[in-house]
Amino acid sequence: MAFGGLPEAVSFQSTACSWCGHLLASPPVNSFTAMKIATFNVNSLRKRLPIVLDWLEQQKPDVLCLQETKVQDSEFPLLALTPSGYHITFRGMKSYNGVAILSRKKPEAVFHGFDDGGDSEDARLLRVIIDGIPIVNTYVPQGFEIDSPKYQYKLGWYDRLRKYFEKHLSPDKPAVWCGDMNVAPRPMDVHSPEKHLKHVCYHEDARKVYEKTLAWGFEDVFVRLYPNRQQYTFWDYRAPSSLEANKGWRIDHILATAPLAEKCTRVEVDIEPRRAKDPSDHTFLWAEFSV
């Protein structure tokens, strides 16, 4: 969650010795038998590098999707990240937005942004294909205020995203969509929901357009496994005691089409990085699939 002419998405693999758009990678490894996919709104990658590197070392996800990296491509911290052994794909801009995907295996294809001829999506959408599975990473606009043009832009962004799914994916084939959606879908996904009816991340129109996008063919795997569990992924900086009081929001999500959702075996929110020194206001969410 945030209030606030780009180059091609860059894909970097650690064994490459030269830049060529999408670089050559390490030799392929065997296909996954299980895939652990994580998402994290990092709220400035350069500021949270120690948190990201520590989490990669401890949790060893197969794929990590990052949002709000807040760094233009020319300043992306490749040197700090490549020793981790991950293939790194990113698309950013100065000071705002930005998405990246770190993966153990080289993506078979990389795509960025909408291709509908509309306005720039400001480094908010990145799609890769890994082991034949499309993985879409999104940082959805927050919307600012209900009466703001930014809120209408957010609603329209979801409409564009649903059409993007219709064009590029199939609900009958495995696919993952994850990221900071800036929507708390249910009353239990936000503290004191009655006080947030006009908040851009809980307003009725935002929830409706989000559910309409899901109805294309995605299922929230957290809700699938734990339909009655109240757990948050975001705690506002502006309320210093929000974490201790657990006054948060569940606005970061991992979703999958039916063929993959039914193979989801575990979903967890790791709250410890939110307790770290100089943390993001979000924390890591991860899911494991038997593939």
Question: What are these model-derived regions, one by one?
Answer:
Residues 40-41, 56-74, 135, 164-187, ...:
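Active-site beta-strand/loop signature of hydrolases that rely on acidic residues for catalysis
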Residues 84, 157-251:
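Metal-dependent phosphoesterases centered on the DNase I-like endonuclease/exonuclease/phosphatase
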Residues 268-291:
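Surface polyanion/phosphate-binding segment centered on an Asp-His-Pro turn
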